[in-house]
């Protein structure tokens, strides 16, 4: 009996010790993960400041925005140490060692390369010109016209509600207004939500968006125009109109532009087993305003930003 009691006591002590060790290990793991997350957020804040600087300096260099501009070049995943090594500031060997384990990637997207859903209303009325543009996009993508009608009706109702109905702030929230997840996924590459009326930048728009925003422009002609544009971006609306043939007669501001002021910045930091992604929308003005910002923490491998 005494032997059994002793064995049970030893087993209990071993169990308690193992439990304590496990809890300590988990605590260290949580602490390490939180530390990595905070470090990643700090790096992403620096990356966002850098992106705002790039956009500000770019605005000073000309009156057009196109896909050959420096901001349009994605940053493929690279070690942080590759940036520190080229810095003129003194960087310690210890810092470089840590930076070897940190990977950065990111890109800046022109949101005015897309149709702005906010444009569907003007005041508290539907905008006929913009509804027609979205109708062409819906038809091109094989989406029902009825879905667009519901979307416009809901937007008009929200604009007339005196604040009783909340307007979306993200494209992902357009399901509030009647779009199904499948319809939204189909539209997502071609639309945006910006809290002001915006024109489409003809220099950065895809063939699908050009077809939608320029009445009478066939998709095949839009595709040819994009190929020509890649060799020589359009400096003025007049140049763009000439390249779009007969349909170019419909090109005019402010619905069409060759420059942009609204951009999305996507940054990603991979640090150990922690990956943090941040998306921000910047309004390029005197203050480089951040319209909104969201972050997500992922575990394990992630897909490329491209």
PLM region spans:
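Compositionally biased linear targeting/interaction segments
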Residues: 1-306
């Amino acid at each position: 009996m005494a032997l059994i009691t002793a064995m049970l006591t030893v087993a209990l002590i071993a169990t308690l010790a193992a439990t304590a060790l496990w809890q300590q290990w988990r605590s260290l793991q949580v602490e390490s993960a939180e530390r990595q997350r905070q470090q990643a957020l700090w790096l992403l804040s620096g990356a966002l400041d850098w992106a705002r600087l790039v956009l500000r300096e770019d605005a000073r260099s000309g009156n057009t925005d196109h896909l050959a501009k420096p901001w349009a070049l994605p940053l493929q995943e690279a070690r942080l140490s590759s940036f520190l090594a080229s810095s003129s500031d003194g960087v310690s060997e210890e810092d470089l060692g840590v930076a070897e384990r940190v990977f950065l990637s990111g890109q800046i997207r022109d949101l005015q390369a897309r149709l702005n859903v906010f444009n569907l209303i003007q005041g508290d009325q539907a905008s006929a010109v913009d509804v027609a543009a979205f109708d062409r996009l819906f038809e091109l993508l094989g989406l029902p016209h009825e879905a667009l009608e519901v979307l416009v009706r809901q937007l008009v109702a929200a604009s007339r509600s005196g604040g009783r109905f909340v307007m979306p702030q993200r494209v992902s929230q357009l399901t509030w207004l009647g779009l199904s997840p499948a319809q939204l996924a189909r539209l997502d590459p071609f639309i945006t939500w910006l809290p002001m009326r915006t024109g489409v930048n003809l220099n950065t728009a895809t063939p699908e968006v050009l077809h939608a925003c320029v009445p009478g422009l066939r998709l095949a002609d839009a595709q040819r125009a994009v190929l020509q544009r890649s060799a020589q971006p359009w400096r003025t609306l007049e140049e763009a109109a000439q390249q779009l043939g007969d349909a170019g007669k419909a090109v005019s501001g402010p619905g069409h532009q060759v420059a942009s002021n609204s951009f999305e910045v996507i940054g990603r930091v991979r640090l150990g087993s922690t990956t943090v992604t941040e998306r921000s929308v910047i309004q390029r003005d005197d203050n480089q305003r951040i319209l909104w910002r969201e972050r997500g923490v992922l575990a394990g491998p992630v897909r490329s930003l491209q």
